[in-house]
Amino acid sequence: DYKGKLLVINFWYINFGPCIAEMPYLNDLVNQYQNEDIHFLALSFDTITDIKSFLNKTEFKYEHGSISRSLMYDFTPVAPGHFIVDSDGIIRDIIVGAPRQTELIFDKLVDLIEKNKK
């Protein structure tokens, strides 16, 4: 239950290099905010079985869920996508696509999280 909490959502899928490339930086983000009331959710259109198999081999510290491809593309036409949802459930910021320098995603998300913390 994420009601009343800041939520960072990542839309991704297993077979897309830019999604995989940013995972170490997203893990760093989770580590940085581990003592704060901020939640991290990764949503993929891959099956639960495929996600679990992938996570057995690759560390990705977000909580995980599976959604339909059409629902994912209703939110973001390009992966990866990142949404910052405030404690009132309002989408406050969106990053669509991966930066050319993947490590920049960490700084961009930190800036948005800090801006939206209450």
Annotated model-derived regions:
Residues 8-9, 40, 82:
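Hydrophobic beta-strand anchors of alpha/beta hydrolase catalytic cores
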Residues 3, 11-28:
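Conserved redox-active cysteine motifs that mediate thiol-disulfide chemistry
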Residues 115-118:
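Non-globular targeting/processing and membrane-anchoring segments
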